[in-house]
Regions:
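N-terminal Sec-pathway targeting helices
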Residues: 1-13, 17-21
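Boundary/entry segment of secreted carbohydrate-active catalytic domains
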Residues: 21-57
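Aromatic-rich peripheral "rim/lid" segments of glycoside hydrolase catalytic domains that contact
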Residues: 37-40, 112, 282-346
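Short, acidic/polar
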Residues: 39-54, 126-141, 192-209, 298-307
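Substrate-binding cleft and catalytic face of glycoside hydrolase catalytic domains
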Residues: 55-73, 86-159, 275-281, 320-327
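Glycoside hydrolase catalytic-domain groove-lining segments
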Residues: 82-89, 96, 103, 175, ...
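Aromatic-lined carbohydrate-recognition surfaces of secreted/lumenal glycan-active proteins
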Residues: 101-109, 149-155, 161, 170-201, ...
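Substrate-binding cleft/loops of secretory-pathway carbohydrate-active enzymes
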Residues: 169, 187-219, 223, 276-281, ...
């Protein structure tokens, strides 16, 4: 009898240890994930702090405006007012144990042009100047105020082919910066019927800059569906086979390929959708429709959450964009989206 009781007690202890260990592992995994927000360049610090609380995030991506005259200009300069505001915010964030990602944010033609289209005339001069800008930010902000992560490039699609230059910049930054270093690449598309799109994808996948960084960052504006509204289930299916233009792009697999090739975690450095119809058609386009649709935006976030939140190779995500709620801020998350995001990695 005593022997039977002893066996039962031993089994209960073993089961208890298993479940405790499982819960601890889950807690550790959750704590290690980045749950971040991107800020509008005209962010308000008070609003940022409110958004941090409402969205239950542990990290903030702080942009420093880099003024660029036009899409072909080599005149690039740190905006002093943006730099000073960033320092003020970073001090507050660190005092609250919020992690900080620092980003030199290309602001082209007063924000009217996309950085994905930036193509400076003098490439050699650009890389020299960009290295100098990063060096300045490291000396005056990143190391001085204990920044956790530095993004060395942001969606410079037309410059991505200069692999050696970017590898040199990553090495330069790693030799000077105390935290982690990442490179942010823009979203892409492939189509079963478009051979060129697949070639472009494999060029991106094989870019050696991804072998040099601590983790891989992606601006995840993948085009999923041409419908005005979708169910969450439809959007989940689209992430494995996009329906827009009958491309049948397997976004999940193509993202996972980066992890399999480089054994580095994947971070959604920008994850955003406009509060409008067709949010899943062109997630990058705030003017995709004239009809507001808070729930469709939330369904897009929910689809990404359901697909990616339990994947160990995903380092986390950053919501684009908060910190300012003006009438033109169509990417600012709706009430429905805030509910989805706040519960992510909880």
């Amino acid at each position: 009898m005593k022997k039977s009781i002893l066996i039962i007690i031993t089994l209960l202890i073993i089961v208890g240890i298993f479940f405790i260990g499982k819960n601890i592992t889950k807690d550790i995994d959750t704590k290690e994930k980045i749950k971040s927000v991107n800020l509008s360049t005209d962010y308000n610090i008070k609003q940022v702090l409110k958004d941090i609380n409402d969205l239950n995030v542990n990290t903030v991506n702080v942009p420093i405006v880099i003024n660029i005259e036009n899409l072909n200009s080599n005149n690039i300069k740190i905006d002093d007012s943006s730099k000073n505001k960033a320092i003020e915010l970073i001090k507050i964030l660190k005092s609250k144990n919020i992690k900080v990602i620092l980003e030199a944010y290309p602001w082209i033609d007063n924000g009217s042009k996309y950085e994905t289209d930036y193509n400076p005339k003098n490439k050699e001069r650009f890389f020299k100047d960009w290295e100098h800008i990063l060096d300045t930010l490291i000396k005056e902000i990143a190391n001085k105020y204990d920044v956790d992560i530095l993004i060395v490039a942001s969606n410079f699609s037309k410059l991505e082919v200069y692999e050696d230059n970017w590898c040199d910049i990553v090495k330069f930054v790693k030799n000077r910066f105390n935290g982690e270093v990442t490179y942010k690449t823009s979203w892409w598309y492939t189509a079963t019927w478009d051979k060129k799109s697949k070639e472009n994808y494999y060029k991106k996948l094989n870019n050696k800059v991804f072998s040099k960084v601590d983790f891989i960052s992606i601006a995840a504006y993948f085009e999923l569906s041409d419908k005005k509204e979708n169910t969450v289930k439809e959007l989940i299916n689209c992430l494995s086979s996009t329906t827009i233009y009958n491309r049948h792009q397997n976004v999940v697999e193509e993202i996972n390929n980066f992890y399999k090739k480089y054994n580095k975690e994947i971070y959604f450095a920008e994850l955003g959708f406009p509060r409008k119809d067709n949010a899943a058609t062109q997630p990058w386009n705030s003017q995709v429709s004239n009809t507001e649709n808070n729930k469709e935006q939330a369904r897009c976030f929910k689809a990404y959450k359901d697909v990616f939140q339990d994947k160990k190779y995903i380092k986390g995500f950053s919501v684009f964009a908060v910190g300012e709620k003006g009438n033109d801020k169509y990417f600012y998350p709706s009430k429905e989206s805030i509910e989805v995001i706040s519960d992510w990695y909880k």
